[in-house]
Amino acid sequence: MRTVTAPPRPGPGLRVRLPQVAPSVREFLATEAGGAVLLLLAAVAALLWANSPWSGSYDRFWSTTAELRLGSAGFDMTLHHWVNDGAMAIFFAVVGLEISREFTTGELRDRRTIAVPALGAIGGLILPAAIYFVVNRSGPESNGWGIPMSTDTAFVIGILALFGPRCPDRLRLFLLTLAIVDDIGAITVVGIFYTDHLNPVGLAVAGATVLAILGLRWLRVWQLPPYILASLVLWGAIHVSGVHATLAGVLVGLLVPAVPPRPDQVEEVPVYVRALQEDSNATRVGLAVAAAKATVPANDRLQRVLHPISAFVVVPVFGLANAGVHLDGSALRTAATSSVTLGVAAALIAGNACGISVAGVAAIRTGLGQLPGRVRYGHLLGAATLAGIGFTISLFITELAFTDEALQEQAKIGILAGSLVAALAGTVILRVLGERMPLCSPMTDEPVPRLPPRPWRAPVPAK
């Protein structure tokens, strides 16, 4: 059968050849490592800006008010709140889309595959919160127990990318699955424990919008515009309700259909393509494009649109808006003895390393799950330590947990210090112990070869 090679891009070529991006650069930008580098650069820029002679402009800029109004209704927030309440809804929508896809068609369908990272994530949620609460048992400081409960997936996967082939693929899968379960826990904490002053009207409108999205699913609506319009209404309703508006992104991500297309939908595409080949006109082009799009779940198409925006725009801007901690001598001396700073740092480093590794080993030893492939206990410990890099969601919860700016500054210093130590310690553990400890689940990656049927005879020697 003759294979047809598709052109690199559809449509006629340009008359003027534009410079092409190197394949290595394209591959880098397509990975989590690219987003992690941008986030790191944004955080460094925020720190330099906040500690420069122009530090006052940092606070003034993010305190600038921006208004979005339609008639008598509208939203009036500072740029800082637009980033945290508005733009971050896109980030959480991507998280919800990934969770929904993994549960529908991905790795989260297999109980034994998800058991180890799921139990590890639970350990990584409970122990850090417990360590922080032991250090801060009372007063407004105790509200920060949710800060060290999250893992920054972009940073962790970015660090693993530096190891290249030496890092088992199954370890990346373990961390991605752990991050998904971890995000579910962090989102639940935000929705339940960091919400107050509920508005019944806003909740009612939000509930009706969720029902409308479910109705779109039931009707098998595959086009994206109805879901996007409902998402905007849901965001506004949840923002008015008093629940943190980013929950709208999570709900939309979970509700957008991720079910693979039916066989008859795929079989329809060649029909429209043949009709287009017979007579190329705008109507038939539209039908062929629509038929092709209908074969891709709405979840995948929306994620393809939102993921680059989230990784390369939203998250770096969030880092720029929230990582600007004042690191003068007075602030560092206060942080060195602050129970908030010490509690956050200790919980991120020790809580995640111990909680995830102990729970993961327990799941393996009890037979609840397995870590197949070349994953060793040294890899598990190193990955658990890297999971202590809690940047994006930790900074996000800090803004919700504390109203006192001094406590926010102390928590952010703890996040920066704890994440830095966790990154260095995890990298060292992976390099030193990664290949020197036993396999977590030996003989589970490949089936054991069967013996040939009896009678067994020695091969006849050649004459």
From Swiss-Prot:
One of its GO terms (biological process) is regulation of pH. Residues 444-463 are annotated as: Disordered. GO terms for cellular component: plasma membrane. This is Na(+)/H(+) antiporter NhaA 3. One of its GO terms (molecular function) is sodium:proton antiporter activity. It comes from Frankia alni (strain DSM 45986 / CECT 9034 / ACN14a). Na(+)/H(+) antiporter that extrudes sodium in exchange for external protons. HAMAP family: NhaA. Its main location: membrane. It is found in: Cell membrane. It catalyses: Na(+)(in) + 2 H(+)(out) = Na(+)(out) + 2 H(+)(in).
